[in-house]
């Protein structure tokens, strides 16, 4: 019953020590001098580096969608002698997952900046990478960002396809985590509110609200778990389908199967 759920249950919350949220928060942030920026090919052309003031940093801009562990090996090998203090991940979940994993292995401080709003990777202790062609999740408290900066500016240049892909991911994470056996009152509160914010933003095309929904979702599922929908989706992701595209099908199937 609810009483025993709230009173006889011990749970722990973990998240990055510092989260900065708000319009133009990235543009106003003063980044450390010695940084490695990890991102994808389009970062420069989309103006992300100009806006963030990161053009003069060391830049690796070759992160692929659904990235492989070989990409992290290449980065670690290429930059292991460099004297930077921070690794900055700027982009979608792929860029941030690579950046977090590299910083974890290289023992560098981590600053994560999402430019899509769905993965929640900026606030989780998870890095998802392909190993031998199959997606694998790495979990460790040392994978957490030291600073997450969430700025709705980046929604402006997002295509409808990227927005849909990201929002489906966030909604799937929220509904799966709400029903997770690892859920607790705090994560349920976050996931329910995240879903409502995301749904409202899509129905009313108020996309500037998506970053808040995504952030709350990341904190919610990051302290519980995704479930069957995400597990099933990796079968499609391994065949090259986008993460959101796969989840649009598998999460519904999972909820029907679980009657949740």
Regions found by a protein language model. Name each.
Residues 1-86:
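ATP/NTP phosphate-donor binding region
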Residues 64, 90-92, 240-244:
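Active-site nucleophile and cofactor-binding loops and adjacent substrate-binding regions
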Residues 69-153:
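Glycine/threonine-rich beta-strand-loop-alpha-helix active-site module
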Residues 100-109, 221-224, 238-240, 256:
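Alpha-helix C-terminal capping segments
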Residues 126-224:
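Carboxylate- and glycine-rich phosphate/diphosphate-binding segment that chelates Mg2+/Mn2+
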Residues 226-244:
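Histidine-centered catalytic micro-motifs
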Residues 238-260:
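Gly/Pro-rich interdomain helix-loop hinge
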């Amino acid at each position: 019953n609810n009483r025993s759920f709230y009173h006889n249950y011990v749970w722990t919350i973990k998240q990055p020590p510092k989260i900065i949220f708000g319009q133009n928060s990235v543009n106003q942030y003063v980044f450390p001098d010695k940084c490695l920026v990890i991102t994808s090919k389009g970062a420069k052309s989309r103006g992300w580096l100009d806006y963030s003031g990161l053009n003069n940093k060391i830049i690796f801009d070759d992160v692929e969608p659904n990235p492989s562990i070989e990409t992290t090996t290449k980065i670690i090998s290429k930059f292991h002698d460099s004297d930077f203090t921070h690794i900055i991940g700027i982009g979608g979940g792929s860029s941030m997952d690579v950046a977090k994993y590299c910083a974890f292995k290289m023992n560098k401080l981590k600053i994560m900046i999402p430019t899509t709003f769905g993965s929640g990777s900026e606030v989780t202790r998870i890095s998802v990478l392909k190993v031998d062609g199959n997606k694998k999740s790495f979990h460790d408290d040392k994978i957490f960002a030291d600073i997450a900066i969430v700025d709705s500016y980046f929604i402006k240049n997002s295509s409808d396809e990227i927005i849909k892909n990201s929002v489906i991911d966030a909604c799937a994470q929220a509904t799966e985590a709400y029903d997770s056996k690892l859920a607790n009152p705090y994560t349920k509160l976050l996931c329910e509110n995240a879903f409502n914010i995301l749904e409202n933003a899509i129905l009313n095309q108020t996309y500037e609200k998506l970053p808040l929904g995504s952030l709350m979702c990341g904190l919610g599922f990051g302290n519980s778990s995704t479930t069957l929908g995400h597990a099933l989706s990796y079968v499609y992701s391994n065949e090259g389908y986008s993460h959101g595209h796969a989840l649009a099908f598998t999460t519904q199937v999972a909820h029907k199967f679980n009657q949740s």
